[in-house]
């Protein structure tokens, strides 16, 4: 292998296979664009985003790591979320959970 070389498998790569997912309609009620990162606990996303928060507890965006979704002011869109895995403990963000889910 050459340093920096990529070894990419053929076909599509499925992210988060076999994990629980859900789709949620989200609206930006604020006056500025809002970006939510791939691993941000969606339940604790910006308060200007209007959606069924309780339904999203323990979920994050089902998008590739390191990417984000941007929602413009007044925009509404459907996003797919995926359940957190591992120990299912959430700390930080807006401090609404701070422990086990």
Curated annotation (Swiss-Prot):
Assigned keywords, A-Z: Cytoplasm, Hydrolase
BP GO terms, sorted: urea catabolic process
Pfam families tied to this protein: Urease_beta
Subcellular location(s) per record: Cytoplasm
InterPro entries given in the database record: Urease_beta-like (IPR002019), Urease_betasu_sf (IPR036461), Urease_subunit (IPR050069)
A GO molecular function held by the record: urease activity
Pathway: Nitrogen metabolism; urea degradation; CO(2) and NH(3) from urea (urease route): step 1/1
E.C. no: 3.5.1.5
Family recorded in the similarity comment: Belongs to the urease beta subunit family.
Name of the protein: Urease subunit beta
Source organism per UniProt: Alcanivorax borkumensis (strain ATCC 700651 / DSM 11573 / NCIMB 13689 / SK2)
Upper taxonomic lineage: Bacteria, Pseudomonadati, Pseudomonadota, Gammaproteobacteria, Oceanospirillales
């Amino acid at each position: 292998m050459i340093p920096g070389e990529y070894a990419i498998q053929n076909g599509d790569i499925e992210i988060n296979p076999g994990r629980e997912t859900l789709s949620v309609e989200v609206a930006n009620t604020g006056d500025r664009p809002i970006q939510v990162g791939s691993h941000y606990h969606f339940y604790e996303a910006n308060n200007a985003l209007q959606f069924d928060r309780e339904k999203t507890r323990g979920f994050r965006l089902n998008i590739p790591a390191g990417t984000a979704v941007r929602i413009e002011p007044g925009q509404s869109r459907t996003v797919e979320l995926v359940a957190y895995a591992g120990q299912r403990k959430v700390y930080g963000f807006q401090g609404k959970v701070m422990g086990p889910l």
